Amino acid sequence: MKHLEKIKLIQGGMGVHVSNWRLARAVAMQRPGVTVGTVSGTALDIVYVRLLQLGDPGGHARRALRSLDEQFDVDIGRRICERYFIEGGKAPQDRFRSAPMQIVRAHDGRRTFPMPNGSAVTTPLKLDDEIIELLIATGFVEVWLAKEGHNGKIFINFLNKIELPLIYVLYGAMLAGVDGVIVGAGNPEGLPALCRRLATHEAVAHEISVLYRETGEEFVIAFDPKEIAGARFAAKPLETPVFLAIVSLEDLVKALAESPSAPPDGFIIEHHTAGGHNANPIGPLRRDARGQPIYSSRDEANLAAIRAVGIPFWLAGGYGSHARLQEALAAGANGVQVGTVFALAEESGMKPEYRSAILAALKDGVKDEDLVQTTVFSPTGFSFKVVQIQETLSDDDVYASRRRICDIGMLQQRGFGKPDEQGERTLFQRCPAGPIENFVKNRGLERNTDERRCLCNGLLACVGLGQVKEIQGEVVEEPAIVTLGNHLDGVRRLSRQGQTHYYVQDVIADILG
């Protein structure tokens, strides 16, 4: 854990493939040990299934999949390529073939469950083996590519709310030697200990949420690494990555520090001005005249209390400058985590047209508060920052004209229907951003679908991997959704008010000096 002490700048994990292996690798190579690159662990199965169908530009995915097969004497990578790779890429008008939906089942394949008899019961659930292999492989690929050819540190970021793929992608990342794990959007209790068990290939179980369960019922994703690929992955122990929990207030810091299983190795204290998902304001939701949620002093972290816990921490949310780094260090932090200014660097995975649109808005004098707004768009229920760009999902007309569909399902909720006459309950999966009738049919309230927008398809479109369809002879791509933090001063400074593009090395020099 000694390398944590040197880390001054962590590049944040962002969106779906915005903080991809290229960006993370560039950051990690700048000042090894001081700067850390972070890849996003979100939707990697979808990302690589689609990249392979685009012909795998540069051959990077296939190279990493070959390394997986050769290193562990498996044929998982070969089978993935056979299934999805298209030489020269698919035709622009052709739809992407879908990765398998992550449908959770009992270990015997059932999706119906009897009512419990009143005693406490833990039920293990799993995904299909094909999906598990794809998740492990793509977690490996992203980290392997990020770590290739240098000795810098690479972390991987997860949203705790995306529960089903987490432990499988994490295991794949660990097979590739990931140096650290960052988890936000929820309480990550139990995950630091789970990392340690995965390092020795032990069977693990991670609790997941299931709505309308009975008192005393618990459901877990259960995974035994030795049951995959003939136990070939389990031939020798792995390095245990450091674990950082993203939190907003000192209460969760104290609770996790006293974890009965294992505390995190560090914390990222994220202010509500950071991009992506944020904690909601404490207490009843109030809005200002512009419709933005009102945060108060109750939503500000007590840094003295966090410092007293004695575990390293980094500050995030508006810390993308040398002056703010110095403030963080003076407050007792080890350093800062920065996202927004990296998201607009040339190495990021954001589609160039959206980077250019944002820089053009800055050049035209659009104010930060008009360009980035806090919304209730996310199906998670967390606040979510959205950049206001025409012809994206930030546009109400675009949202209204898009047919609701849930064909990826990363943010689906799981729950039980009402028991039948035999006391059997069917496990459903639903999303507030999906078809309203399906949400209501599965015990949802229609009002909870208001303003909910499809982040899965929107964030994939943000990085040029949006699904396509043909409408009256015209190829139409899913509308994108773009997220940044509230503070764009670093972007303004480096781009000279939107007049020029910039690179990772410029960001590092600007923040670290």
Regions found by a protein language model. Give the residues of each.
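Active-site entrance/lid segments in N-terminal catalytic domains of soluble metabolic enzymes
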Residues: 1-308, 486-513
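Conserved active-site-proximal phosphate/metal-binding subdomains
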Residues: 10, 43-44, 66, 264, ...
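Hydrophobic residues within well-ordered alpha-helices
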Residues: 27, 328-329
